[in-house]
């Protein structure tokens, strides 16, 4: 019997990153989604193409050996697939984890295989597998909880690969940058050993990798997007050609680098090289990376542990002054009423209907006692006054 992986999320990251890795590692991939058009297309076509983009050109890979199930209509089939799978992964967005947990919990509970299921969430969030794990426990009978870990093991991961805006009419095919990093903690797998997935970097301590990635790649990418949007730029490449915006992005990453170096013991030289490589990657003219796409979901990106408030709050707690990150927060607060982005409309509503103090806490989760609170409050108040 061959290896099988169940992957929740048939979107570009699911097909173009996680699906590619699983396919190249010899897994049959069962995609699970609620989007009828995605599931129908996956079941209609026996292959799709992943085009890897770099400054040297393009390389194509054909992905086969997959099936797809619509969890909206065929949840029992999803549960059955999980009960006999080797790996479950997901790329659905942190807010959707609570919805995929019940079928995963039921699939785990009905397992009879001797080897535990490996569960790895592939989200742009710190501790996403821990979050999913918590929801799975909530959906598991209390009497079965003591034996849960004989049936499943849960490992956090950090993923890094830019998926630009896709061409109209591309269908299942995905364009994606050639660079990738998928780091997964190996400790949870213990003596059983981690699953055999090609090109994953298995580590004992994930936190330095995930914070370095989130507070460099995601912070830099979003900073460029929000400044670019305010300046009327179309793509991240266009934004970073503007010296003023490039300077602001570098300033924000200088602040996050200070935290990464202090907290995780990464050398300043190594972090500087990492920052330089990130700026080069997100500046790639071959990635048609639209600022509205990168900036979308501002409520999530302004939240407590995310790419701006996460590092800024830790720096403030360490007694450091935070300036560039607060300027980036100001730009993010201006990302309002953007077409096809529900959160940007909600951001406008929150800023309009709440006091600066209430909006600050609602948006960032910061309490008044926190050393960063007053700095964020200033930015919220300023943007509120400018947009009245």
Curated annotation (Swiss-Prot):
Catalyzes the NAD(H)-dependent interconversion of D-fructose 6-phosphate and D-mannitol 1-phosphate in the mannitol metabolic pathway. The keyword NAD applies. This is Mannitol-1-phosphate 5-dehydrogenase. One of its GO terms (biological process) is mannitol catabolic process. Gene3D superfamilies: N-(1-d-carboxylethyl)-l-norvaline Dehydrogenase, domain 2, NAD(P)-binding Rossmann-like Domain. It comes from the Eukaryota. Pfam families: Mannitol_dh, Mannitol_dh_C. Its EC number is 1.1.1.17. Transmembrane segments: none annotated. Monomer. One of its GO terms (molecular function) is mannitol-1-phosphate 5-dehydrogenase activity. It catalyses: D-mannitol 1-phosphate + NAD(+) = beta-D-fructose 6-phosphate + NADH + H(+). The active site is at residue 213. One of its GO terms (cellular component) is cytosol. Keywords: NAD, Oxidoreductase. Belongs to the mannitol dehydrogenase family. Coiled coil: none annotated.
């Amino acid at each position: 019997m061959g290896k099988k992986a169940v992957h929740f999320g048939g979107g570009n990251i699911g097909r173009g990153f996680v699906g590619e890795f699983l396919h190249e590692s010899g897994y049959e991939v069962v995609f699970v989604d609620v989007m009828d058009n995605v599931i129908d297309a996956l079941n209609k076509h026996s292959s799709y193409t992943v085009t890897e983009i770099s400054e040297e050109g393009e390389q194509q890979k054909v992905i086969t050996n997959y099936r797809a199930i619509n969890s909206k209509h065929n949840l029992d089939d999803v549960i059955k697939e999980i009960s006999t799978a080797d790996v479950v992964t997901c790329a659905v967005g942190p807010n959707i984890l609570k919805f995929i947990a019940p079928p995963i919990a039921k699939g785990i509970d009905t397992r009879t295989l001797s080897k535990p299921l490996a569960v790895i969430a592939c989200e742009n969030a710190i501790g996403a597998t821990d979050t999913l794990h918590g929801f799975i426990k909530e959906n598991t009978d209390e009497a079965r909880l003591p034996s849960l870990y004989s049936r499943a093991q849960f490992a956090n991961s950090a993923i890094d690969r830019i998926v630009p805006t896709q061409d109209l009419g591309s269908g299942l095919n995905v364009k994606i940058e050639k660079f990738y990093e998928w780091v997964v903690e190996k400790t949870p797998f213990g003596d059983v050993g981690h699953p055999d997935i090609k090109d994953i970097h298995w580590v004992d301590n994930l936190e330095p990798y995930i914070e370095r990635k989130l507070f460099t790649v995601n912070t830099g990418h979003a900073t460029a997007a929000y400044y670019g949007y305010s300046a009327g730029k179309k793509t991240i490449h266009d934004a970073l050609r503007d010296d003023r915006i490039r300077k602001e992005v570098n300033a924000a990453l200088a602040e996050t680098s200070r935290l990464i170096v202090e907290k995780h013991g990464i050398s300043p030289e190594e972090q500087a090289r990492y920052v330089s490589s990130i700026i080069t990657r997100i500046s790639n003219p071959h990635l048609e990376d639209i600022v509205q796409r990168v900036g979308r979901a501002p409520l999530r990106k302004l939240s407590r542990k995310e790419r701006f408030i996460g590092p800024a709050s830790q720096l403030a707690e360490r007694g450091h002054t935070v300036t560039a990150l607060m300027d980036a927060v100001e730009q993010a607060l201006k990302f309002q009423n953007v077409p096809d982005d529900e959160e940007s409309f909600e951001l406008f509503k929150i800023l309009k209907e709440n006091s600066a103090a209430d909006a600050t806490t609602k948006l960032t989760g910061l309490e008044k006692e926190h050393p960063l609170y007053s700095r964020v409050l200033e930015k919220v108040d300023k943007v509120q006054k400018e947009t009245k």
